[in-house]
A protein has these predicted regions:
Chain B
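Conserved alpha-helix/loop element of class I SAM-dependent methyltransferases that forms part
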Residues: 30-48
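Conserved Class I S-adenosyl-L-methionine
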Residues: 196-262
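Short, glycine-/aromatic-enriched active-site segment of Class I SAM-dependent methyltransferases
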Residues: 20, 154-174
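A short acidic, Gly/Pro-enriched loop at the edge of an enzyme's catalytic core
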Residues: 108-119
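A short glycine-rich, Lys/Arg-flanked "PGG" loop and its adjoining helix->strand segment in the class I
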Residues: 133-148
């Protein structure tokens, strides 16, 4: 008689949260039908089966190969008391410092998007004061020493009445790069605005919302046909030459067929240095879905977006779009050279070992001197014929055919996929590695983007988090960090 | 199909039906085994939604790997009725009958409606076919527009030494293989673009080592003697050593190629 078999391969166990009540629940990770699933059950709200990835090989690559020693904040801001994710942050059990720190300077926005994790809109009038913003910036510096990237966000940060003063405050601190996350409306419409922004060069980058070329898609995501805004904002940014990343929020079945076109468009804009794709995070305002947001129907995972990029931009090979080691299962990236003849991928030419083992943990690798030098060396001429793989030969062939311009750092183009973690796919193993963090308006805490939108934003902390904390009746005695583990080992001998 | 290619196809198919072939090469007949099949499937963008054609599927091992690990639906076709029967039985045993089907067909004359598949694969078989260009055209026309093809096979950059042109060399697909550039040109000529060639010579070193070990084991246990072989394989040791040297010198190797139907 043959033994009974599970309908899946068991891979691992983890801790998740119930997507209804956000209580911690036991979970399994299993492989079935070519996909990675999370199985979990809440005593009150029942069982859930959540798609984590539709590419087992890539998922395993991210989890098992792209691992690096995590970097920590200078000092944690909270203690480990209720358990993850109720102790943010940064708590001593978090396994990554903040690569990108967001400061939301206003709740106000000149759009009211049906999809908005922050729930911003014209009806919300609260702007943070400069004093408060200074406290938040000082928190960033206290945690990171020299923060790699500060992203000014909102709401729509450019509507803050003291927007440029805020940029000055950032500049007065030891911050590597200043990013402004904007829908581009003020840049497009206001004479002189782009020029004033340009005064903050170098080290300033615009994160420009850019979801689609189709009016019906823009109406669904942004309640506004922003095509002219996009065109005019990019004209202005090209004129003043401010480095720009196009940021596309991707909703399943709506604009997931435009990824290749957005990349192509980005490569044709002189100021554009990369494209970031973010599937909609199930958090905040999620309007305009037929009979409401339905995670089984509407959720979109990183591996699906990755494959769609590879299908729609065939110039990229699978080995060109790889996990980012600091948070490998939720960040993927590709580097390419932007030439007049098109994109020439670079990532596949670099030994993954090199990417894993060098540079600080940051999602913008090319800003790290060692990696930057390595990329530049790739297109220097000292490679011997013997050391060339076929990929390298192809690469050099393409360079031969497009020699007129001087190649340099300016030619590097980045494609990034950022899948923020929602309650459905919450995986404790992964949430501890998140590196995009939001500075809490209290200026005391730094909270992962993902958990901030689920438990800490605005009223959530009081309405949702507090009751959950009360349920955790036995306070933990401390973190499960290495330092404590070592101490208990010593004390037992 | 010409009489010669008919003979060749059936000759090769017969050869692959022999138990000795499976004993020597293992479940996956091609170099790299299931590991390379997974690599080829990833490189060809196979997903749970993909409808995949595996041309010259042999015992269906790759079809099962792709159905089980990638969740794809796979149609395998082969010239050998015996291999197909084994493939079906193994799929049934693995509970994959809903995800796999097997069809008797020649690679040079596929019985599928044009544009039926998202991905077409041909592992370690292309250079066995009399007319590679015809086979590539078949692999292309089976695809939907924008579909991908994935090939693994030997390449031969300099002519093979005489010792490798014997039967064993033929079984190992070495003798008639094109060069790496030859594959590129053939794919381009058949109407593919975004052609990518990846060298995977490690698969050959592994396979040669495995065959050598198995020969020793079979001889030592007297599981099989020369008299059991319907075809004279001869002493494999010198051929394998020649093959290793030839690969090390860069004369031949193994590759996977992927391309898009343009």
């Amino acid at each position: 008689m043959t033994a009974k078999q599970r309908p899946y391969q068991y891979y691992d166990s983890t801790i998740s949260i119930c997507s209804t009540c956000l209580q911690r629940v036991d979970a399994k990770i299993v492989f079935q039908d070519g996909c990675v699933w999370m199985l979990k059950r809440c005593p009150q709200h029942g069982a859930e089966r959540v798609l984590m990835a539709d590419d087992i090989a890539y998922y395993k690559l991210a989890r098992e190969t792209f691992i690096k020693t995590p970097e920590q904040v200078i000092a944690p801001n909270t203690s480990a008391r209720y358990g993850c994710p109720y102790d943010c942050g940064i708590c001593p059990d978090h396994e990554q410092h903040g690569c990108t720190l967001l400061i939301e300077v206003t709740d106000n926005c000149n759009l009211r998007c049906p999809t908005c994790y922050a729930g911003s809109g014209p009806e919300r009038q609260t702007h943070r004061s400069l004093e408060q913003i200074e406290r938040m910036l000082d928190r960033a510096v206290a945690n990171e020493g020299e923060p790699s990237i500060i992203q000014i966000s909102g709401g729509e940060p450019t509507v803050h009445p003291q927007f440029f003063e805020i940029l000055e405050l950032v500049r007065q601190r030891p911050v590597g790069h200043l990013l402004v996350n904007t829908n581009g409306i003020r840049i497009a419409n206001e004479a002189g605005f782009a020029e004033r922004l340009a005064e903050f060069k170098p080290g300033l980058e615009i994160y420009l919302q850019f979801d689609s070329f189709r009016p019906e898609v823009l109406k669904a995501l942004r309640a506004s046909d922003l095509r002219n805004t996009h065109t005019r904002a990019l004209e202005r940014l090209n004129e003043v030459d401010i480095h720009t990343t196009l940021v596309a929020t991707i909703r399943r079945g709506l604009n997931d067929d435009e990824l290749g076109e957005i990349i192509d468009y980005g490569t044709q804009q002189p100021c554009v240095r990369g494209v970031t794709f973010q599937p909609v995070q199930a958090a905040g305002r999620l309007e305009g879905y037929e009979s409401g947001y339905n995670s089984a129907r509407d959720r979109l995972t990183l591996t699906e977006i990755r494959r769609k990029i590879l299908e729609q931009s065939p110039v990229l090979a699978p080995e060109d779009l790889i996990p980012v080691p600091c948070h490998p299962d939720h960040l993927a990236m590709a580097y390419a050279l932007k030439l007049e003849s098109g994109l020439v991928p670079l990532t596949g030419l670099v030994d993954p070992e090199f990417l894993i083992n060098s540079g600080r943990a940051t999602i913008t690798y090319e800003k790290e001197p060692a990696i930057r030098e390595h990329f530049l060396n790739l297109f220097s001429t000292h490679h011997s014929v013997d050391s060339q793989t076929d990929a390298m030969s192809d690469f050099l062939d393409k360079l031969d055919r497009a020699p007129p311009q001087q190649l340099g750092y300016e030619n590097i183009f980045r494609i990034l996929i950022v899948e923020f973690i929602d309650a459905q796919g919450f995986d404790l193993r992964s949430i501890r590695k998140t590196c995009v963090h939001i500075i809490h308006p209290d200026g005391k805490r730094v909270i992962p983007f993902d958990t901030y939108n689920l438990l800490y934003r605005d009223g959530l902390e009081k309405q949702v988090l507090e009751p959950l904390r009360k349920r955790e009746f036995t306070p933990l005695t401390g973190p499960i960090s290495l330092a404590r583990y070592g101490k208990s080992e010593n004390s037992s001998t | 199909m010409s009489a010669t290619s008919q003979n060749l196809a059936s000759c090769c198919a017969n050869l692959y039906e022999l138990p000795i072939v499976e004993q020597l090469l293992g479940e996956s007949f091609h170099p790299g085994g299931a590991r390379l099949t997974r690599k080829l499937a990833s490189a060809s963008l196979i997903s749970p939604q993909s409808n995949v054609l595996d041309v010259a599927c042999g015992n269906g091992n790759s079809a099962r790997v792709i159905a089980a690990d990638f969740g794809a639906t796979v149609t395998g076709c082969d010239y050998s009725a015996l291999n197909l029967a084994r493939a079906s039985a193994a799929s049934q045993a693995a509970g994959l009958t809903g995800k796999t089907q097997f069809v008797r067909a020649s690679a040079e004359q596929l019985p599928f409606a044009p544009g039926s598949f998202d991905v077409s694969l041909c592992e370690c078989s292309l250079c066995l076919f009399e007319n590679m260009d015809t086979a590539l055209q078949q692999l292309r026309s089976a695809l939907k527009p924008g579909g991908r093809t994935g090939i693994s096979d030997f390449f031969l950059n300099t002519p093979a030494p005489d010792s490798l042109n014997g039967l064993l060399g033929r079984v190992l697909c070495v003798a008639g293989a094109p060069s790496a550039d030859g594959y590129r040109e053939a794919l381009s000529g058949a109407g593919f673009d975004f052609i990518r060639i990846r060298r995977v010579n490690w698969t050959l070193t592994d396979t040669i080592q495995r065959i050598r070990h198995r020969f020793k084991l079979l001889a030592a246990t007297k599981t099989i003697t020369a008299a059991d072989l319907p075809i004279d394989f001869g002493d494999p040791a010198p051929v394998l050593a020649d093959l290793e040297d030839f690969i090390a010198s860069g004369g031949a190797g193994y590759l996977i190629a992927t391309a898009r139907r343009s």
